[in-house]
């Protein structure tokens, strides 16, 4: 330990003592030392120098305009005296360290208040005007071992007018003494003037005492061996540090470094024998090697702290030499871990622990973390461990993947894969080096997923989709997204599933009644899966649309027809299944399905027919809903598609205005009876084509028809009216035993019922002759009146079907809870004739469109080959056409002289103007 005292003018002695705190100690400046008086270091006599002012005492602030640029410099400048303890250099940041030494320093100021400051061992301390490079020069200012020499040198400095406020002689146990100086500013310097620091080197450098080098090295060697053997060091660490500095100052650094390396190498070599025992268990061996490594690191940190001056001067200036810490790593790597037997046993033990953990056993993870950190510090992690680790991982998961794919169902297997990936990610965080991350995760993904992509999908995708296993599907997509090409394989299977499942809905005629609803449900299902499971991936959305378009058109025309009927069922009056808002959403969903069908003209034909019924019979649930659907169709298909449908609505509006005028006209006519006539004027080009049917109307009805005809043609001359009896409907008043009822019936039902005002019983043939109704239509009419829910007629004999010999009477005992009763007409399951007629009209319209397209193209191109003509026709048409049908239309146009075959090339056509 060193003590330092200085005399002052007031006769009191201020003492700076060093305290030991875990390492070695050194005098350190205090933050409050600026108030401490600067005194001259003499032989103990009171200085005759006048007391220095407070301004002059603050040496650092008065000597440089940049005094605040370094905290360390400020602290040192403000001390009352300076020790010969060397400035400490910062540690190499690249050297790992698990501990550090602190210097505990207390400086007694003039106020006698101890101020404690701790400096980290790595911190830089430097005197004003000195740095590490001046180590040798500053040593020349050291006095000999006697205090007299120090006093003599101080007198020399005074004679040379060097401004040095104090010089302290410090005597060391090793016989060397060294003084350091604190430089003050010029006392008489003017404010704002330039301030100079004058430092003059000492001329003489004292010689080392005899045997000093050997004795000093012996002390250092004993200290190093004590550290290596974990015994107490009998020398003060500060003394040892100073000894190293002294040796370095006298250019003995090279030999000192060599000796230090040798003693460290000898100690490490002696450790290898304990690891060559074959009887050691692998875990015990790992613990032993880890303990050896931890001890080595701790020892090298302490050794380096003693030889820090050597590390920061000589070693730093010689780039070919490793630092003391790196030297320790090299020696441990060369003599311990590079031993093939030790290395193999270490790597085998680490791999065994990892394998046990993967099998579910509990292991010492901190041991693994320490050992793998050791391999990384020794720079053999990748070459010695990582390659073998990845090979073992690949082997383990390859076997596991093959086994579990056969034993487990897909959901269980997917959860297992996810668990494995999470475990490996945790290992990377806990003890593996981050450089292993990419290779490790890629290996697991390849063996558990990449090798089984197709097998997983073929084995379980359909079940997951059928059962709507949202969580499992989400996990499936998440895992497949990690593997290169995984999403593409999933996408292909996704398309195949939609096509296969959708085809079962469309192709099977038995599902016609529920086809549209099933399509809507299926569409909702796949949309939900895409949104939740596939994260709205655009590729899956487009693939779904293509798949729907493919399977829904496998059965031409029928889906379009059924979609039209489904819309009719939703827009018809009496549909109380949904609110207006729900109905609007339903129509939006139907339009999505509608986009997929090719035969939109088929939809239009059936939709128009059903719309006509709703409008004429007043069955529309909502005019707003009807117009909303019309707007959606117009937006989807264009104005040309909906022009006729819009014309139907216009006809209904005009008919209302005409009937108001007709009622005013009727008030001036003397017409017997109380029949009220309502007529809808329909433009033939807008409405579906109806087959006219001549029936025998009662004279009263005929009379009213003639009156209306006279009225209408009087306003619109040149027009022709054609009565459509199939669309007529009436309200009859009837009296039964239970009371009066109103019957809402068709015109044909009306004609049959009115006959029973003239008689009580009629045969089928008699009714047919009297009404003139066509046989099939009459049978359906009688069936609705005598065999339906509201049986206002009785049939003899009883039965569900109408036979030739059947007779009918009025059912006077008819009962019903309602006053107005609607008796529905029995429809021929879309009457085969009516359906065929509608389809035929569609085909006829298509022929016209094909002919028009061919003529337009030929008129523009004049001459064209068959293949190019067919290609351009396909591009213009909005519905599918078979090549054979297209060829027939071309032949038809040739026959009608619209075009001709080229005489030289039969495969080429010429337009005929």
UniProtKB/Swiss-Prot annotation:
Pathway: Protein modification; protein ubiquitination. Changing residue 57 to A: Disrupts nuclear localization and does not bind KPNA2, KPNA4, KPNA1. Disrupts nuclear localization. The gene is CUL4B. Neddylated. Deneddylated via its interaction with the COP9 signalosome (CSN) complex. GO terms for cellular component: Cul4-RING E3 ubiquitin ligase complex; Cul4A-RING E3 ubiquitin ligase complex; Cul4B-RING E3 ubiquitin ligase complex; cytosol; extracellular exosome; nucleoplasm; nucleus. Component of multiple DCX (DDB1-CUL4-X-box) E3 ubiquitin-protein ligase complexes that seem to be formed of DDB1, CUL4A or CUL4B, RBX1 and a variable substrate recognition component which seems to belong to a protein family described as DCAF (Ddb1- and Cul4-associated factor) or CDW (CUL4-DDB1-associated WD40-repeat) proteins. Component of the DCX(DTL) complex with the putative substrate recognition component DTL. Component of the DCX(DDB2) complex with the putative substrate recognition component DDB2. Its main location: cytoplasm. It comes from Homo sapiens. Keywords: Acetylation, Cell cycle, Cytoplasm, Disease variant, DNA damage, DNA repair, Dwarfism, Intellectual disability, Isopeptide bond, Nucleus, Phosphoprotein, Ubl conjugation, Ubl conjugation pathway. Belongs to the cullin family. Residues 25-35, 60-70 have a biased composition (Low complexity). The keyword Nucleus applies. PANTHER family: CULLIN (PTHR11932). The modification Phosphoserine is found at residues 53, 100, 146, 193. Residues 1-100 are annotated as: Disordered. This is Cullin-4B. Residues 42-52 have a biased composition (Polar residues). GO terms for molecular function: ubiquitin protein ligase binding. GO terms for biological process: astrocyte differentiation; cellular response to UV; DNA damage response; G1/S transition of mitotic cell cycle; gene expression; positive regulation of G1/S transition of mitotic cell cycle; positive regulation of protein catabolic process; proteasomal protein catabolic process.
């Amino acid at each position: 330990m060193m003590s330092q005292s200085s005399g002052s003018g007031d006769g009191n002695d201020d003492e700076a003592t060093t305290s030991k705190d875990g390492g070695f100690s050194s005098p350190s400046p205090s933050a409050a030392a600026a108030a401490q008086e600067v005194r001259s270091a003499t032989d103990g006599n009171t200085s005759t120098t006048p007391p220095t002012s407070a301004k002059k005492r603050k040496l650092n602030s008065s000597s440089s305009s940049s005094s605040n640029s370094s905290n360390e410099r400020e602290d040192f400048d403000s001390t009352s005296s300076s020790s010969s303890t060397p400035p400490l250099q910062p540690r190499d940041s690249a050297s790992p360290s698990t501990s550090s030494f602190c210097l505990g320093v207390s400086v007694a100021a003039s106020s006698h208040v101890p101020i404690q400051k701790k400096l980290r061992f790595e911190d830089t301390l430097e005197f004003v005007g000195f740095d590490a490079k001046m180590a040798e020069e500053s040593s020349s200012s050291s006095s000999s071992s006697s205090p007299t020499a120090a006093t003599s040198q101080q007198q020399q400095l005074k004679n040379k007018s060097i401004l040095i406020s104090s010089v302290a002689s410090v005597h060391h146990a090793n016989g060397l003494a060294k003084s350091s100086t604190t430089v003050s500013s010029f006392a008489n310097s003017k404010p704002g003037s330039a301030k100079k620091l004058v430092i003059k080197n000492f001329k003489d450098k004292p010689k080392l005492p005899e045997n000093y080098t050997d004795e000093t090295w012996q002390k250092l060697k004993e200290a190093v061996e004590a550290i290596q053997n974990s015994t107490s060091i009998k020398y003060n660490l500060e003394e040892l540090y100073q000894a190293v500095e002294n040796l370095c100052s006298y250019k003995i650094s090279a030999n000192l470094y060599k000796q230090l390396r040798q003693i460290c190498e000898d100690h490490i070599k002696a450790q290898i024998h304990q690891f060559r025992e074959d009887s050691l268990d692998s875990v015990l061996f790992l613990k032993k090697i880890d303990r050896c490594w931890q001890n080595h690191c701790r020892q090298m940190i302490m050794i380096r702290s003693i030889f820090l001056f050597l590390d920061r001067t000589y070693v730093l200036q010689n780039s070919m030499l490793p630092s003391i810490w790196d030297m320790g790593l090299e020696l441990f790597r060369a003599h311990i871990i590079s031993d093939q037997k030790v290395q193999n046993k270490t790597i085998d033990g680490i791999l065994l622990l990892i394998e046990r953990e993967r099998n579910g056993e509990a292991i010492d993870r901190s041991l693994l973390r320490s050992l793998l950190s050791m391999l990384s510090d020794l720079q053999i992690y990748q070459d010695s461990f990582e390659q073998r680790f990845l090979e073992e991982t690949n082997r383990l998961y390859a076997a596991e993947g093959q086994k579990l794919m056969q034993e487990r169902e897909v959901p269980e297997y997917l959860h297992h894969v996810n668990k494995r990936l999470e475990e490996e990610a945790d290992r990377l965080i806990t003890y593996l080096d981050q450089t292993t991350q990419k290779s490790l995760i890629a290996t697991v993904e390849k063996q558990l997923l990449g090798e089984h992509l197709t097998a997983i999908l073929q084995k379980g995708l359909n079940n997951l989709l059928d059962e709507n296993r949202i969580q499992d599907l989400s996990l499936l997509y998440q895992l497949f997204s990690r593997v290169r090409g995984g999403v593409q394989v999933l996408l292909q299977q996704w398309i195949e599933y939609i096509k296969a499942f959708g085809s079962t809905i469309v192709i099977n005629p038995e599902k016609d009644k529920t086809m549209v609803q099933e399509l809507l449900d299926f569409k909702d299902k796949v949309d939900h899966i895409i949104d939740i499971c596939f994260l709205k991936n655009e590729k899956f959305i487009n693939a779904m649309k293509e798949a729907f378009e493919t399977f829904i058109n496998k059965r031409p025309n029928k889906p379009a027809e059924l979609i039209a009927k489904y819309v009719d069922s939703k827009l018809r009056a009496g549909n109380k299944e949904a609110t207006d808002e729900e109905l609007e959403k339903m129509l939006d969903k139907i339009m999505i399905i509608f986009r997929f069908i090719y035969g939109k003209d088929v939809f239009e034909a059936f939709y128009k027919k059903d719309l006509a019924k709703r409008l004429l019979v007043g069955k529309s649930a909502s005019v707003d809903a009807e117009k909303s659907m019309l707007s959606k169709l117009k937006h989807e298909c264009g104005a040309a598609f909906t022009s006729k449908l819009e014309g139907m609505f216009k006809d209904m509006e005009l008919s209302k205005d005409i009937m108001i005028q007709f009622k005013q006209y009727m008030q001036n006519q003397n017409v017997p009876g109380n029949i009220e006539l309502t007529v809808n004027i329909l433009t033939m080009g807008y409405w579906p084509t109806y087959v006219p049917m001549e029936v025998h109307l009662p004279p009263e009805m005929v009379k009213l028809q003639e009156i209306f005809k006279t009225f209408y043609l009087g306003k619109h001359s040149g027009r022709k009216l054609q009565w459509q009896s199939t669309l007529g409907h009436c309200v009859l008043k009837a009296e039964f035993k239970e009371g009066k009822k109103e019957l809402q019936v068709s015109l044909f039902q009306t004609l049959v019922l009115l006959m029973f005002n003239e008689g009580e019983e009629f045969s089928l043939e008699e009714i047919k002759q009297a009404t003139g109704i066509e046989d099939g239509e009459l049978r359906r009419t009688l069936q609705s009146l005598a065999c339906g829910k509201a049986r206002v007629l009785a049939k003899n004999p009883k039965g569900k079907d109408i036979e030739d010999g059947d007779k009918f009477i009025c059912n006077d005992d008819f009962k019903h809870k309602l006053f107005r009763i609607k008796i529905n007409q029995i429809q021929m399951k879309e009457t085969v004739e009516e359906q065929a007629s509608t389809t035929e009209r569609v085909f006829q319209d298509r022929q016209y469109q094909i002919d028009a397209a061919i003529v337009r193209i030929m008129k523009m191109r004049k001459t064209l080959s068959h293949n190019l003509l067919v290609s351009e026709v396909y591009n213009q048409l909005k519905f599918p056409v078979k090549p054979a049908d297209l060829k027939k239309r071309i032949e038809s146009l040739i026959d009608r002289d619209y075009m001709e075959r080229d005489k030289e090339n039969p495969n080429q056509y010429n337009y005929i103007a």
